[in-house]
Amino acid sequence: MCAVLPQPKCVKLRALHSSCKFGVAARSCQELLRKGCIRFQLPVPGSRLCMYEDGTEVTDDCFPSLPNDSELLLLTAGETWHGYVSDITRLLSVFNEPHAGVIQAARQLLSDEQAPLRQKLLADLLHHVSQNITAETREQDPSWFEGLESRFRNKSGYLRYSCESRIRGYLREVSAYISMVDAAAREEYLRVLSSMCHKLKSVQYNGSYFDRGAEASSRLCTPEGWFSCQGPFDLESCLSKHSINPYGNRESRILFSTWNLDHIIEKKRTVVPTLAEAIQDGREVNWEYFYSLLFTAENLKLVHIACHKKTTHKLQCDRSRIYRPQTGSRRKQPPRKQPPRKRPPRKRQ
């Protein structure tokens, strides 16, 4: 027999698929269940009550100890609820499959909202659900291409070009360093630079890193185009879990340009000077090692601007990989200029 309280207990009640929430007063669990079913026009048989917070079922035994103003959920036969986790799951499903109704509702709420924090949350929600991620061509998503040259006809092509441009920029920096190399070693420096250039051309300047249509081993994103921040150079991962999909909309494309391909072992401070020093030493340089440090994911991390630390990394190249193993005769070293000998003074007779 269910316990009947002398004074009614007031709770806030909602149904699983309803955004409405009502205050209901009842002296027993069964009375509350019956009133809730009437309010939401649901069948009583098979229905039950649970705590909205964690999904704990409300029974006759625990009803008397239920605090006033508790938030309860009314479930019908076959429905389940696991607390806030269920609400978060439902919210995430909106991001995967946005509906016009959700977008319209978010816009309406945003237009009426005055609180800055709620405005921010609604704006972020609207930004994400409005993305046209699956679209690829200019015809399918013309707004994404606003401000871009007409030669770019699809998103993957532009993102590939964007990555290639970054890698080409690194190559120009390596080339510009030749002025710092001794004149006797410049020919060898140019030879190494030429080898790197040919290698980059063969892999299309690693533009596949930003291309969601590339092979999984050659890209830094998911097949849908989601990129995750790999964290600062001195951490294994991003503690803030930054992520972005530049394929989604124009704003995301522009924001993605602020993300950095950061060299773990620094390019300007360490890698290029070490390369120049090794060439000037006269031994045969393992240029493929330096290539991997300068232009590949072996030494590059994709990072959100907040995770891009501008401090000195204080990391050095692997000395065991700088030169090729000497299997035969050592490559002839470039001649070094010797200081002129001073003649001894003649003795006066």
From Swiss-Prot:
One of its GO terms (cellular component) is protein-containing complex. It holds the Pfam family CIDE-N. Residues 329-349 have a biased composition (Basic residues). SUPFAM superfamilies: CAD & PB1 domains, His-Me finger endonucleases. The keyword Ion transport does not apply. Signal peptide: none annotated. It is an enzyme of class 3 (hydrolase). CDD domains: CIDE_N_CAD (cd06535). Residues 7-83 form the CIDE-N domain. Its EC number is 3.-.-.-. Disulfide bonds: none annotated. GO terms for biological process: apoptotic chromosome condensation; apoptotic DNA fragmentation; DNA catabolic process; negative regulation of apoptotic DNA fragmentation. Inhibited by DFFA (DFF45). This is DNA fragmentation factor subunit beta. It comes from Rattus norvegicus.
